[in-house]
């Protein structure tokens, strides 16, 4: 991902304020509510029958935290996202058979959640930088797909 110095600073400054537990669970939960077909990958998570059930599901929250932890790792390796996410790309492609479009959807949901949490602080410049980052991460996660 090519980010200007200003964009990198904007991304890292905001990310330093992100509560990974809270934002991760909310982002994954919203993905599952807004795009219900994505729930098929999480059937072992128990009750996903209503938006409230999804948003309060401890397994959704825990996995969201894990997902955002990996995203955090990617932010420290913006110049090598494909290498950083190679193992996760392989896992999601070969073992889990996740449609790579879901990575793009989750990235866009994450941007919405960040905007919700940070309000005026999430300026158009910050949003543009995050859109580049989530697109780069989605591309890296889709890399092993044939």
UniProtKB/Swiss-Prot annotation:
Q: Which domain of life is it from?
A: Eukaryota
Keywords, sorted A to Z? Acetylation, Heme, Iron, Metal-binding, Oxygen transport, Phosphoprotein, S-nitrosylation, Transport
Q: Which residues carry this modification: Phosphoserine?
A: 44
- N-acetylvaline occurs at which residues? 1
Q: Which residues carry this modification: Phosphothreonine?
A: 12
Task: List the record's Gene Ontology CC terms alphabetically.
Answer: blood microparticle; haptoglobin-hemoglobin complex; hemoglobin complex
Tissues and organs where the protein is expressed, per its UniProt entry: Red blood cells.
**Could you tell me one molecular function GO term of this UniProt entry?**
oxygen carrier activity
Give residues where S-nitrosocysteine occurs.
Answer: 93
Record-listed N6-acetyllysine modification sites: 59, 82, 144
PROSITE patterns noted in UniProt: GLOBIN
Specify one Pfam family: Globin
**Heme as UniProt keyword:** yes
Which residues make up the binding site for heme b? 63, 92
Q: Which residues form the Globin domain?
A: 2-146
**GO BP annotation list:** hydrogen peroxide catabolic process
Q: Key word Amino-acid biosynthesis present in the record?
A: no
Q: Subunit comment for this entry?
A: Heterotetramer of two alpha chains and two beta chains.
Role played: Involved in oxygen transport from the lung to the various peripheral tissues.
Q: Record's family?
A: Belongs to the globin family.
The protein's name in its UniProt record: Hemoglobin subunit beta
Underlying gene: HBB
């Amino acid at each position: 991902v090519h980010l200007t110095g200003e964009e990198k600073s904007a991304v890292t400054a905001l990310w330093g304020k992100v509560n990974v537990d809270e934002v991760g669970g909310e982002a994954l939960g919203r993905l599952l509510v807004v795009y219900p077909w994505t729930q098929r990958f999480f059937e072992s998570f128990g009750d996903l029958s209503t938006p409230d059930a999804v948003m309060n599901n401890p397994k959704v929250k825990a996995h969201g935290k894990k997902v955002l932890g990996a995203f955090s790792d990617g932010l420290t390796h913006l110049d090598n996202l494909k290498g950083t996410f190679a193992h996760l790309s392989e896992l999601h492609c070969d073992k889990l058979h996740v449609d790579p479009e879901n990575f793009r959807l989750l990235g866009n949901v994450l941007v919405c959640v960040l905007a919700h949490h940070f309000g005026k602080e999430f300026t158009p410049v910050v949003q543009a930088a995050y859109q580049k980052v989530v697109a780069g991460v989605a591309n890296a996660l889709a890399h092993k797909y044939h």
